[in-house]
Amino acid sequence: ADGEGRLGDTVAAYRAAVAGADAILLTTPAYNGTMSAVAKNAIDVASRPRGAAPIVGKPVLVAAAVYSPGADERVLEHATTALRIAGAKPLERTFGITKHVEAFDEAGLVDKDRERELQALVADLLSPVPVS
């Protein structure tokens, strides 16, 4: 099923890393109005094998960096939906950055309020019971 007998070392190592993680921070750009294929594939690979998927029950903070205003909401919704279907436990709150080209400088996020917001979300993710 799903070609499980032909897994490479990279897939096995990735699944082991997901299994060993206390929590996951999934970040993605927007491509054609949704998450990147790499982010989607990361969710899909961690959702297998059925019955022993390493992503099941993992708390996940979803973050997206996009250019177009409003596009972050679509990307975050798509990623959160895929994670829930895969059995993960995405936080209710997500983090989106629009006009990402202008949002960062060499030191990080330009908007220090947004930086504090992200830090609080990561703290929630890493708390024993994630706050949604």
What are these regions (language model features)?
Residues 1-8, 103-107:
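N-terminal beta-loop-helix "entrance" segment that forms/cooperates
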Residues 4-7, 11, 111, 115:
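Flexible, glycine- and charge-enriched loops at secondary-structure boundaries
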